């Protein structure tokens, strides 16, 4: 069987100067097919390759469960892949920092009426900050991951771009990558479709070639976010009132604000209303869930905080994604942007379901300009 073009030209995917035989590549290995293929591509370059896996949470109860990143079986899979490729492999216990930086923050955000994205927090902390430090300690020339994004050299240095395969693009989750980190990171899969990734895994004889993709949220085994929040913050189930945002009328009682998010319609248990009602906002101090008709979800602008900018601001129109699966929409950026500053984005058309706690990620074409956390929104006033 002839080698795939990616394997034949593997060295070009890592963009390292000098002979590859003199280079050391650390690969972040989760045990899934994507990071396993990255390890295989790295090994094909002739460089010294070291696989590193982070144990991020107590996976005992989840052992044998499919669809979770870095659970017990995944660590064993990563080790088996490393053995197959003939590379070193290390597992580091980061359970304590992961719980503090990601899981507890996840629970606190829900308690404060926000809709968190723990995968972004994880990328900002354990997956990049901690792994990069380890890679440097191991004397690596770069850290390679299985994310579907592209690192493209621009006039001012490396830029973060969307993946070639839009169905696999993960750039939304990596907006917090710093310029210093991007200089050291490599994303060999950003130019490949998922189908080719699996073909490479088969060609390399990796047992994970047909392994299902992992979930985004690894520490929620069954999708029951409320259960996870309760386990960390038992007070999350405190009941409160469901209030009509326009009239102030109390329509019912809820089971705890952790069960609700902006834009939600189902599960409100307030039947008999003259029109469909949606969650418009969450008032955490008073434990109130505010509901209203769909037009009340229309947002004109959003304030974003803790912003990160990757490279200079372009002299080009900007678009923004306010949810991971949303389409980018035109925006105008106001205020300082980057280095933790707060800014505002204004939408050219009403945007619906913009939830505090989510990320707003800015793009110029395929380039990721940066982003920040949505802190508050301004309603679009619809005339008539």
Curated annotation (Swiss-Prot):
It is an enzyme of class 2 (transferase). Its EC number is 2.8.1.13. The record marks 147, 358 as: Interaction with tRNA. Its main location: cytoplasm. One of its GO terms (cellular component) is cytoplasm. Disulfide bonds join 122-218. Belongs to the MnmA/TRMU family. Catalyzes the 2-thiolation of uridine at the wobble position (U34) of tRNA, leading to the formation of s(2)U34. This is tRNA-specific 2-thiouridylase MnmA. It comes from Novosphingobium aromaticivorans (strain ATCC 700278 / DSM 12444 / CCUG 56034 / CIP 105152 / NBRC 16084 / F199).
């Amino acid at each position: 069987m002839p080698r795939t073009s990616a394997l034949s030209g593997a060295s070009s995917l890592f963009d390292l100067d000098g002979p590859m035989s003199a280079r050391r590549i650390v690969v972040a290995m989760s045990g899934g097919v994507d990071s396993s293929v990255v390890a295989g591509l790295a090994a094909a370059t002739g460089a010294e390759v070291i696989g590193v896996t982070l144990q991020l949470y107590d996976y005992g109860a989840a052992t044998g469960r499919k669809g979770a990143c870095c659970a017990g079986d995944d660590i064993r899979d990563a080790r088996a892949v490393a053995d197959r490729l003939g590379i070193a492999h290390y597992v580091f216990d980061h359970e304590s920092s992961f719980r503090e930086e990601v899981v507890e923050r996840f629970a606190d955000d829900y308690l404060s009426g926000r809709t968190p994205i723990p995968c972004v927090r994880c990328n900002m902390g354990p997956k990049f900050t901690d792994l990069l430090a380890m890679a440097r300690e191991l004397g690596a020339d770069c850290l390679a991951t299985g994310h579907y994004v592209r690192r493209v050299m621009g006039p001012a240095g490396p830029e973060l771009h969307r993946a070639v395969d839009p169905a696999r693009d993960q750039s939304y989750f990596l907006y917090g990558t710093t310029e210093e980190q991007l200089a050291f990171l490599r994303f060999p899969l950003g130019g490949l479709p998922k189908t080719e990734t699996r073909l490479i895994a088969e060609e390399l004889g990796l047992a994970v070639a047909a392994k299902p993709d992992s979930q985004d949220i690894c520490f929620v085994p069954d999708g029951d976010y409320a259960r996870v929040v309760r386990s960390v913050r038992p007070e999350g189930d405190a009941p409160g009132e469901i209030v009509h945002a326009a009239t102030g009328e109390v329509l019912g009682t809820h089971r705890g604000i952790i069960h609700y998010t902006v834009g939600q319609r189902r599960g409100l248990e307030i039947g008999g209303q003259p029109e469909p009602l949606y969650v418009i906002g969450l008032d955490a101090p008073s434990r109130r869930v505010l509901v209203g008709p769909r037009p009340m979800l229309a947002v004109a602008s959003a304030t974003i905080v803790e912003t990160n900018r990757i490279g200079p601001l372009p002299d080009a129109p900007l678009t923004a994604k306010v949810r991971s699966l949303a389409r980018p929409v035109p925006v105008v950026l106001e205020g300082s942007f980057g280095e933790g500053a707060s800014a505002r984005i204004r939408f050219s058309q009403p945007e619906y379901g913009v939830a505090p706690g989510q990320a707003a990620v800015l793009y110029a074409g395929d380039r990721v300009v940066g982003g920040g956390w949505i802190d508050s929104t301004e309603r679009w006033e619809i005339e008539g």
